[in-house]
Curated annotation (Swiss-Prot):
PANTHER family with a match to the protein in the record: GANGLIOSIDE INDUCED DIFFERENTIATION ASSOCIATED PROTEIN 2-RELATED, GANGLIOSIDE-INDUCED DIFFERENTIATION-ASSOCIATED PROTEIN 2
UniProt-listed InterPro entries: CRAL-TRIO_dom, CRAL-TRIO_dom_sf, Macro_dom, Macro_dom-like, Macro_GDAP2
Signal peptide region: none
Similarity remark: Belongs to the GDAP2 family.
Domain Macro as annotated: residue spans: 40-221
Domain CRAL-TRIO as annotated: residue spans: 329-486
Annotated source species: Nematostella vectensis (Starlet sea anemone)
Protein name: Protein GDAP2 homolog
Pfam families named among the record's database cross-references: CRAL_TRIO_2, Macro
Source organism, top-level taxon: Eukaryota
Length: 502
């Protein structure tokens, strides 16, 4: 009996055609040959490596291998098509292990779990980066880390066959071809060092990914000398270091192999003899501290002034926040407490405090907004010192419950940076169209740092994917509205652990 729970339509990784056996395109000889005679390829033909590599267009959840790779998010609960398919095929036990034992995964890291009902014995979870051209270098380094850490787990756990998915996703904005270069290059370098420990690495692609990988594969896994020569014309400028890691020129140590004088054949002995006749005074000319060139003093002064301005802004922000904090510790907030506008309600599955805001209880038009700011700070200041999440119930709220946009902007800039940094999710339950529009404008033009953390939920039960119902103190009118609009049991959480069934 197969302990992995074999099902129909499984594909044995060992039955897939190896890259070395696939047909090679008819490359036109000529300029490529002359180029290959002048330059050595950093990725030469290697029949042994090519016999370990597979490019397969298929469903990774059907692949019978020692392990498969799943691209997910930091909480190991991504709702992308691939991740959902993996969890659906594995069964609820996989999510239970992710929540109870793995406890999240940072971008660039990789963690391993059992495969449960999957044909693969293990699942290696990794979190790909979000791509932003402004932070391209960081994204490239993080994606490299995903593949490097994945292959490290392969070696540590003595995994001989693995199906590797495309870690970079269009959902996170990563250019597919750029991601393919990093993936293939990193695995190639790994196989060069540790190939004896691995039998098969299958790059599992779907749809448009297949075209991209078919184009890039020959660069890092050429099948003959003609393809190797052709690959030189397609080689990117950055081919990585000995591990495949992207090279950052600004961080390279520049060492001159020879002093300029020696490169021009100057006689060292003659130079030393001439130096011996110099007066001691001459030897020290220009070596005193006051004679050393120190750069453009005007430019340095401007830079110091700029840094000083930035520092002053930070100091001023902290001073303003401390003033509000002192007020928060002295005010009487009995009225706000009775209204239950803002309160902590248990923790989520990762142990992060859950802060609840009930919009209907906040009569913004008739409230001293200054006092409201102080109240919010009094409740949140100690909570936000660590990771936390916010649940905002928009249910039955009206215009009088919504503070002006100017107030939200001011509040955003008043609070300490820890509020933004440690906020991991902001769930808006029962949002209206207008609420979605206002949120989009606010997170786009004012609070861009939290935009990716906002999630709109049309029903309360969707919260149970992240928070146990026992940990939520939900107003009765919210539950009544939710039942009226959505009915009962309209959503089943991904595992019994999430619903408190275990």
């Amino acid at each position: 009996m197969d302990p992995l729970g074999a099902t129909a339509n499984l594909v044995d990784i060992n039955s897939l055609p190896k890259w070395s056996t696939t047909p090679v395109p008819n490359y036109e000889p000529g300029s490529n040959e002359s180029q290959s005679s002048s330059f050595l390829s950093p990725f030469p033909v290697d029949e042994e490596i090519n016999a370990k590599v597979v490019l397969w267009n298929g469903d990774i959840t059907k692949l019978a291998a020692d392990a498969i790779v799943n691209t997910t998010n930091e909480s190991l609960s991504d709702r992308g098509a691939l991740s959902e398919r993996v969890h659906r095929a594995a069964g609820p036990e996989l999510m239970q292990e992710c929540r109870q034992q793995l406890l999240g995964c940072r971008t660039g890291e990789a963690k391993i779990s059992e495969g449960y009902n999957l044909p693969a014995r293990y699942v290696i979870h990794t979190v790909g980066p979000r791509y932003n051209t402004k932070y391209k270098t960081a994204a490239e380094s993080a994606l490299f880390s995903c593949y490097r850490n994945t292959m490290r787990l392969v070696r540590e756990n003595k995994i001989s066959t693995i199906g590797v998915c495309v870690v970079n996703t269009t959902k996170r904005g990563y250019p597919p071809e750029d991601g393919a270069h990093i993936a293939l290059r990193t695995v190639r370098r790994f196989l060069e060092k540790y190939g004896s420990a691995v039998d098969t690495v299958a790059f599992v692609v779907e749809g448009a990914e297949a075209v991209v990988y078919a184009k890039v594969m020959p660069i890092y896994f050429p099948r003959d000398k003609l393809e190797e020569a052709h690959a030189l014309t397609l080689m990117p400028d950055d081919i990585g270091n000995e591990e495949g890691e992207p090279i950052i020129p600004e961080r390279q140590i520049r060492i001159v192999p020879k002093p300029p004088s020696l490169q021009h054949g100057e006689d060292v002995e003659e130079a030393e003899e001439a130096e011996g006749h110099l007066d001691m005074t001459e030897l020290h000319v220009g070596k005193h501290a006051f004679a050393v060139m120190a750069g453009d003093h005007d430019q340095m002064t401007k830079q110091r002034a700029h840094r000083s301005d930035d520092g002053m802004k930070v100091v001023e922000q902290q001073r303003v926040y401390q003033r509000w904090l002192r007020r928060a510790r002295t005010e009487n907030f009995a009225d706000f407490s009775r209204q239950k506008i803002l309160y902590q309600s248990g923790v989520d599955f990762l142990g992060r405090p859950v802060v609840v805001f009930v919009a209907r209880h906040f009569t913004a038009q008739n409230t001293d907004l200054g006092k409201a700011v102080a109240y919010f700070i009094s409740v949140l200041d100690r909570i936000v010192n660590r990771d936390y999440v916010v649940v905002y119930f928009h249910t039955h709220s009206t215009e009088e419950n919504q503070p002006p946009m100017s107030f939200l902007k001011e509040l955003y800039h008043i609070v300490d940076n820890k509020y933004r940094r440690n906020l991991k999710a902001f769930y808006i339950v029962h949002p209206t169209v207008w609420a979605r529009i206002v949120t989009w404008f606010f997170t786009t033009f004012t609070a861009s740092s939290v935009k990716e953390k906002v999630h709109f939920l049309s029903g309360v039960q969707y919260l149970y994917d992240w928070i146990n119902p026992d940990q939520l103190d939900i107003p009765a009118y919210v539950l009544e509205y939710d039942m009226k609009e959505n009915g009962t049991n309209y959503h089943t959480p991904a595992s019994t652990y999430r619903t408190g069934g275990l």
